[in-house]
């Protein structure tokens, strides 16, 4: 017994040495200094507190070189297989380094504002970027979204067809997987641990080791490729948009947190079997144009993309508590002092202006889409991820797989655009080719600013973004700001609008809810 125990201890010791050697290393050629970004947390009383945050760029964009030198381990879209002979050896031999955010990646911040440039030319040409909000130098900020709302300003006026300025949440580890995977020495500080509902296989490192084995360089992306492994987790797309179209989309997974997948069993964009994985790659999307309203979002339209807009997303629960079950995802916009409720779907068979179980089920049926949303947990599955906490991602990208046509054009391109769900925007079906977009619009950019987070009704009536600066107050029965209260009939239900300048709908809330004045333009049943 004693000798067996000694052997066991020796094996453990050897294993720990091996892990220490075969690790995802950190380089020393460039100091890592995260750009600062302020944001705010708000309370139900209407007060907001500024948080001095920072952002880090994803490890996939970083210089990857030999630990003790300057030789690239990865150049263009190819690994140096003389260095990276296996996933484990590559982790031992190669290091990710610090980033020069402005000159290399076109990432700049000022106060609460973050600007991401599309094409940045330095020693190499950089395309787009993906950054994460940090709690401190080594930890991502975790957002717990149930029974809360998330608000930010965005300027998409310089984003043409084929680009996507995306704001979303994913179920990454707060430390980037550093504590869970002993071979990950870089951690969140260097942007490790990414995952999403596509189970991306284009990541150079997953779970602390490289993804070199089975790597196939892309024919269309000079910087990317696909390896044997992917990284899966739940994803909540708050905002995927350019100046033409926008969508918000929950994507649940069987397991909310980050997991490893292999080959086509990953499913999603990067695999031959799109629905073969443990996540929902399609999600349940709300795109106003796809839902039949062709005049709601775009240049000069109701939500005018020629100007910045405040985007408000609410995550409602069945019992109005932080521990309840996710029941509805609502959207509002604020522009030029006016609160704009999300557009209503024009399809009688698929009504509504928010995401609910009923909306998603009827949409899948009407559009003829495969209902993988329900298969992977639906709203309850998404709620499980929101409850565990998610990391905020802010990005700008183009699409080497479908040219972003799923967002802003007719898709599939060979389908009848008069059929429900096919038309998603006004972009031509031959638009969005990355090489063309990069050549024609190198100066494209997106600006995100004024991020706020707090209880329902707390973030967009208190000077947030381009919205009004009035204070949130509560009325016992009806809104005192609407000039049309005497002509309104019926009752507004929980969370619905019940007043505001120019409002002509119901101003009395169903019991026991009270009409709450969020600002002079908008009151809500809370």
UniProtKB/Swiss-Prot annotation:
Q: Which SUPFAM superfamilies does the UniProt entry name for this protein?
A: Cellulose-binding domain (SSF57180), Concanavalin A-like lectins/glucanases (SSF49899)
Superkingdom of source: Eukaryota
Which residues does the annotated region (Ser/Thr-rich linker) include? Answer: 459-490
InterPro entries from the xrefs?
Answer: CBD_sf, Cellulose-bd_dom_fun, ConA-like_dom_sf, Glyco_hydro_7, Glyco_hydro_7_sf
**GO biological process entries:** cellulose catabolic process; glucan catabolic process
Q: Region (Catalytic) spans which residues? A: 24-458
Primary subcellular site in the record, as a coarse category: secreted
Do the record's keywords include Hydrolase? yes
Subcellular location per the Swiss-Prot or TrEMBL entry: Secreted
The EC number(s) given in the record are 3.2.1.91
State what this protein does: The biological conversion of cellulose to glucose generally requires three types of hydrolytic enzymes: (1) Endoglucanases which cut internal beta-1,4-glucosidic bonds; (2) Exocellobiohydrolases that cut the disaccharide cellobiose from the non-reducing end of the cellulose polymer chain; (3) Beta-1,4-glucosidases which hydrolyze the cellobiose and other short cello-oligosaccharides to glucose.
Q: What is this protein called?
A: 1,4-beta-D-glucan cellobiohydrolase B
The species is: Emericella nidulans (strain FGSC A4 / ATCC 38163 / CBS 112.46 / NRRL 194 / M139)
Gene symbol here is cbhB
């Amino acid at each position: 017994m004693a000798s067996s125990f000694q052997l066991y201890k020796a094996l453990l010791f050897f294993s720990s040495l091996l892990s220490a050697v075969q690790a995802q290393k950190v380089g020393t050629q460039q100091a890592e200094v995260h750009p600062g970004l302020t944001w705010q947390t708000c309370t139900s009383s209407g007060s907001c507190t500024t948080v001095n945050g920072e952002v880090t760029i994803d490890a996939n964009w970083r210089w990857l070189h030999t630990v003790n030198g300057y030789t690239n381990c990865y150049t263009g879209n190819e690994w140096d297989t003389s260095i990276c002979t296996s996933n484990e050896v590559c982790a031992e031999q190669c290091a990710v380094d610090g980033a020069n955010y402005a000159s290399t990646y076109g990432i700049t911040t000022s106060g609460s504002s973050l600007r991401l440039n599309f094409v940045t030319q330095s020693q190499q040409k950089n395309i787009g970027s993906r950054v994460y909000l940090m709690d401190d130098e080594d930890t991502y900020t975790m957002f717990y979204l149930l029974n809360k709302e998330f608000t930010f300003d965005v300027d998409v006026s310089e984003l043409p067809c084929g680009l996507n300025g995306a704001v979303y949440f994913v179920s990454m580890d707060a430390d980037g997987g550093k504590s869970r995977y002993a071979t990950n020495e870089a951690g969140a500080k260097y942007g490790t641990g990414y995952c999403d509902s596509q189970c991306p296989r284009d990541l150079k490192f997953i779970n602390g080791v490289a993804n070199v084995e089975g790597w196939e360089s892309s024919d269309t992306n000079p910087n990317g490729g696909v390896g044997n492994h992917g990284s899966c987790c739940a994803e909540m797309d708050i905002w995927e948009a350019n100046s033409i179209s926008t969508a918000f989309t929950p994507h649940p997974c069987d397991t909310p947190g980050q997991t490893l997948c292999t080959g086509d069993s990953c499913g999603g964009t990067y695999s031959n079997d799109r629905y073969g994985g443990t996540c929902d790659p399609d999600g349940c999307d709300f795109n106003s144009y796809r839902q039949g309203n062709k005049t709601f979002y775009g240049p000069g339209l109701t939500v005018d993309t020629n100007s910045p807009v405040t985007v408000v997303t609410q995550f409602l629960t069945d019992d109005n508590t932080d521990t309840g079950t996710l029941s509805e995802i609502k959207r509002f916009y604020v522009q030029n002092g006016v609160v704009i409720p999300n557009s209503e779907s024009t399809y009688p068979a698929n009504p509504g202006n928010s995401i609910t179980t009923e909306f998603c089920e009827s949409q899948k049926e009407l559009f003829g889409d495969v209902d993988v949303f329900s298969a992977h947990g639906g709203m309850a599955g998404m709620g499980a991820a929101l409850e565990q906490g998610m990391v905020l991602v802010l990005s700008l990208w183009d699409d080497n797989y479908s040219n972003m046509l799923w967002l802003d054009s007719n898709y599939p391109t060979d389908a009848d655009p008069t059929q429900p769900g096919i038309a998603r925007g006004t972009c031509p079906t031959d638009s969005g080719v990355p090489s063309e977009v990069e050549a024609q619009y190198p100066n494209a950019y997106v600006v995100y600013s004024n991020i706020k987070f707090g209880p329902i009704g707390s973030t967009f009536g208190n000077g947030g973004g381009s919205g009004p600066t009035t204070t949130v107050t509560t009325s016992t029965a009806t809104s005192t700001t609407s000039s049309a209260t005497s002509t309104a009939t019926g009752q507004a239900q929980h969370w619905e609008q019940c007043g505001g300048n120019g409002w002509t709908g119901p101003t009395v809330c169903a019991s026991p809810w009270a009409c709450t004045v969020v600002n002079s333009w908008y009151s809500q049943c809370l």
